[in-house]
Amino acid sequence: MAKPKFIALALVALSFLSIAQSIPFTEKDLASEDSLWNLYEKWRTHHTVARDLDEKNRRFNVFKENVKFIHEFNQKKDAPYKLALNKFGDMTNQEFRSKYAGSKIQHHRSQRGIQKNTGSFMYENVGSLPAASIDWRAKGAVTGVKDQGQCGSCWAFSTIASVEGINQIKTGELVSLSEQELVDCDTSYNEGCNGGLMDYAFEFIQKNGITTEDSYPYAEQDGTCASNLLNSPVVSIDGHQDVPANNENALMQAVANQPISVSIEASGYGFQFYSEGVFTGRCGTELDHGVAIVGYGATRDGTKYWIVKNSWGEEWGESGYIRMQRGISDKRGKCGIAMEASYPIKTSANPKNSSTRDEL
């Protein structure tokens, strides 16, 4: 039977950087077909996008609609977040959904009859209240933003971000680990570029360990498992747990202790072109994308947010991150962020022969 397809100051600086990496435009650029065409050519040059003439004409029509949407949204004076003309500029939302947010995590979990949150939650009885804010980037537990490309491997990037985090917290060493090993080798239930689940990936790493990004670099496609590297793990974990579902307080308690893997619905226009600010936009709970929460905080006006590390490259969002509204009335959280959270457990030392001195 075929397996189912799953699937502070620093922030200010990140905001400016995200703007610099997108293509700015003004009313003048929207004034005519010629000016819009010139903007499209500028966008294509910036992103080195090659198109034949027929495809270019078709994509130009998509581009115009996207520019109009971004412009009209950014005219809203009270919007707490902004959109930008990023690398998805001539892609329809349907194409974006299928290529970057196509892992129906919740649907495929239910297909397999998997029940969440049947085990314990190690942070449930932590005595002290979590800090008002935390940023694991500032604590040195987060590697640079990576890019999954047009491969549905978000589940691998989410998993690796959490494992990189707990490894740094426990060992003091930040090591960039291999998503490609999961894509190629974790194939019992996960399906590489066709999607997967973070819990399965945690189980794989618990059994096999994981090697470094440098040793097993990302290829943006499914490949044959490199068994020699599979047998030479650098980092290990001892298990994983799920955060109690639909409970942002429990999620906050977990994030206060380590980066956490979560699933969200990320397929809307607001996500496609998100640039900066706290995302409060429209989204549902059809979980289709795996990411990692690496902190939380609040703006000066009191808007609470999660700091979320994405895997769409540094140009998207706040240099690859998005701040998502926290503490909303829906217990499932913004875009379902509190529905499917999990994290690795590490109590043992890494394999003795491993060398965790890796480039970042």
Swiss-Prot record:
PROSITE patterns: ER_TARGET, THIOL_PROTEASE_ASN, THIOL_PROTEASE_CYS, THIOL_PROTEASE_HIS. GO terms for molecular function: cysteine-type peptidase activity. It holds the Pfam family Inhibitor_I29. It is found in: Endoplasmic reticulum lumen. The keyword Ribonucleoprotein does not apply. Residues 1-20 form the signal peptide. It comes from the Eukaryota. Residues 21-133 form a propeptide. One of its GO terms (biological process) is proteolysis. Its EC number is 3.4.22.-. SUPFAM superfamilies: Cysteine proteinases (SSF54001). It is an enzyme of class 3 (hydrolase). Keywords: Disulfide bond, Endoplasmic reticulum, Glycoprotein, Hydrolase, Protease, Signal, Thiol protease, Zymogen. Belongs to the peptidase C1 family. This is Thiol protease SEN102. It comes from Hemerocallis sp.
